[in-house]
Design a protein with these regions (language model features):
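N-terminal positively charged helical leader segments and presequences
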Residues: 1-32
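Short secondary-structure boundary segments
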Residues: 5, 73, 128-131, 157
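Short, surface-exposed acidic/glycine-rich loop or hinge patches that mediate macromolecular interfaces
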Residues: 48, 159-160
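A mid-sequence, solvent-exposed acidic-amphipathic segment
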Residues: 109-149, 153-154
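Thr-Gly-centered strand-to-loop micro-motif
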Residues: 154-157, 172
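Structured adenosyl-cofactor binding patch, chiefly the S-adenosyl-L-methionine
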Residues: 162-172
Length: 172
């Protein structure tokens, strides 16, 4: 049996005892795998109304190798509740299917204002549609080979962030 711990290791194990309520195993070999990115990639997103899109996104960020996923309750959010239990199962399934030894940390939904007030080190990006605020090309900014910082990417709801939310994010 092959086991993953979600923190960079695959473990080869042998089943030693099976009962009606549990299965005992003995780890025979462990192999650690380094992350493909030296720092953390954190996606904070306002969930869409259609939960299938959120489930698909959760699967893909696991396969790609993101480190953290947060859900934001924004002014124009159409979905105010996300069930993390289901998304945790999707993360585990996607990690197994894509043979990833690292799984992203899934955070509880939080208000945009509370999220922005939390400390975040490294590079920060916000996707928005407003012309009055400066814009950075994300691909160009992240395409540098010498990036040695954590990266936080904010993505708003289907109606975009409010002007106040973008302003608050850029000030913090």
């Amino acid at each position: 049996v092959v086991l993953i711990d979600g923190k960079g290791s695959f473990h080869q194990a042998e089943i030693v005892n099976i009962t009606k309520s549990k299965c005992e195993y003995q780890i025979t070999h462990s192999q650690e795998y380094p992350k493909t990115w030296n720092n953390n990639i954190h996606l904070a997103i306002a969930p869409t109304k259609n939960i299938d899109r959120i489930e698909w996104l959760t699967e893909k960020i696991t396969e790609i190798g993101f480190d953290e996923l947060s859900f934001l309750n924004c002014r124009f959010s159409e979905r105010r509740v996300v069930k993390n239990e289901r998304l945790e199962r999707i993360i585990v399934s996607a990690a197994k299917q894509s043979r990833k030894s690292w799984m992203p940390q899934l955070n509880e939904m939080v208000s945009f204002k509370d999220f922005i007030s939390m400390p975040h080190k490294g590079l920060k990006f916000i996707a928005h549609c407003y012309d009055q605020f400066p814009k950075t090309d994300l691909c160009s900014a992240l395409n540098k080979e010498d990036i040695k910082e954590d990266v936080l990417i904010l993505v708003g709801p289907e109606g975009d962030f409010s002007v106040d939310e973008v302003d608050l994010a850029l000030k913090n």
